[in-house]
Amino acid sequence: MISSLEVADQLADGKEFYAVLGDMKELGEYSKEFHKKLGKKCSEFQNLKGLYTFGTDAFWIQEEFVKRTSSPRFSEHFPGTQEGLSELIHKFLQTIPEGSIVLAKASRGIQLERFVEALLV
């Protein structure tokens, strides 16, 4: 996941970008630790203007990001439910400027492609 963020940062070429990150599955007892490490790493990308997280364990990504950043950067967490997905899509469309660089990444089990498909309609 960190490699994907690095690529998004390179593609942004000094401009702002946004990330929508979901749970990393099958981490077992290391899940909380790895999600928090990812949140810390996200905070180090100075051009990452906004972070949305989706799913149960992804909360720790957002929590760590919030601890280490300040405005004008923002983040918001959504539960990994159909209602949470609908709220994420609605909030994203209201907030993120058209044409922005966006990374959407999660374990396959989260089905984050539903988010991407909704944007392509």
Range-by-range predicted roles:
Residues 1-121:
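ATP-dependent carboxylate-amine ligase
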